[in-house]
Regions:
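Extended, helix-rich architectural segments
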Residues: 1-67
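Structured, contiguous alpha/beta core segments that scaffold functional sites
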Residues: 50-171
Length: 171
């Protein structure tokens, strides 16, 4: 196995390829724009139920009130298809209406995730990230993140993204 494509450095190697190989970059941008550009809005589970309609309207207002475009959040999350997983930490805030909303949804780069907290059944309970600025290890509980994994071919918490297929054989 090519050492550049193993361990945490594989995420940097893949990111470098995504930035510097035009055909790869074009494919990534095309896919991410397809998933991010539709108008995102919540649908009430029962359009005849006033509470369901109210909750859908609340979700729409949370998406509109966040400090970054929802399409940007979707694009960052969509990188799970390429890297195998993605982690976004949501930051809560008190809204003017007294409800809890989202201040932001911050991407946690794959190369910063060093360990996984997994129970005996394989359920991911959280992950540990190395802070790129301080090198401190920080715990991220699953309840505080959006964790998306491509687990069709593996039960690893890191999933198996399509970048894996770009690795050159080492011979």
């Amino acid at each position: 196995q090519n050492p550049k494509w193993s361990g945490p450095q594989r995420y940097r190697q893949a990111s470098d390829l995504a930035v510097n190989a035009s055909v790869v970059a074009a494919g990534i941008h095309y896919f991410l724009n397809l998933i991010a550009n539709p108008k995102w809005r919540a649908q009430p589970s029962d359009p005849n139920n006033p509470e369901a309609v109210r909750m859908a309207e609340f979700v729409d207002s949370v998406m509109a009130d966040i400090n970054q475009p929802w399409a940007s959040i979707v694009r960052q999350a969509g990188m799970f298809r390429f890297h195998g997983f993605s982690v976004q930490e949501w930051i809560a805030k008190h809204r003017d209406d007294g409800m809890i909303g989202l201040e932001s949804v911050e991407s946690r780069p794959q190369h910063t995730i060093e360990r996984w907290a997994v129970d005996d059944f394989g359920t991911v309970l959280g992950m540990f990230q190395r802070n790129p600025q301080t090198s401190q290890i920080l715990g991220l509980p699953r309840s505080k993140v959006m964790y998306i994994v491509e687990d069709t071919l593996t039960d690893s918490p890191e999933g198996l993204g399509v970048f894996r297929h770009l690795a050159e054989p080492n011979h």
